[in-house]
Amino acid sequence: LSSQLDSPDISVVDASWYLPADGRDSKAEFLASRIPGAQFFDIDTVADLDHACPHMLPSEPVFTQSVQALGIGADSRVVVYDGKGLFSAARAWWMFRVFGHDRVQILKGGLPGWIAAGYDTEQGEPTVATSGVGFVAAHQPAWVTDTEGVKAALSSRSHIVVDARSCPRFAGE
């Protein structure tokens, strides 16, 4: 990635998000240290803000507008990372796939790996991204299911269902 940061088709996105118990502020950390040229993908706001549950997928227009505001176009190669190495970047990667953008990758090691490798970071307000051209979200239903879909998969054993929460969260703690 370091040798491709100046490439016009590369869009680097910091999708850091932390659990409340972590006591970390993802936006403040983004402003303090990030991969040069990165834009901040706010998982808290790129969502259906009218839903009772947090972090529900946004509508196609909301995702389109949010992604275009980050300078991401239809032909952009998006590289997503987070401040833990691999935590919330996976959520952003999945959201891009749900909305039809296949040219998305997760940076191995995230920001901690980038820093450990000795690469430069920048701080302060990011350069305002030029609005992305041509990206229009197109929901891909194969990437999402509902309760009935999960029940059917469990009963038919056609899929493996994995709960990726930590053990304490899985146990309701």
Predicted regions and their residues:
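Cytosolic catalytic domains that perform sulfur/thiol-centered chemistry
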Residues: 1-173
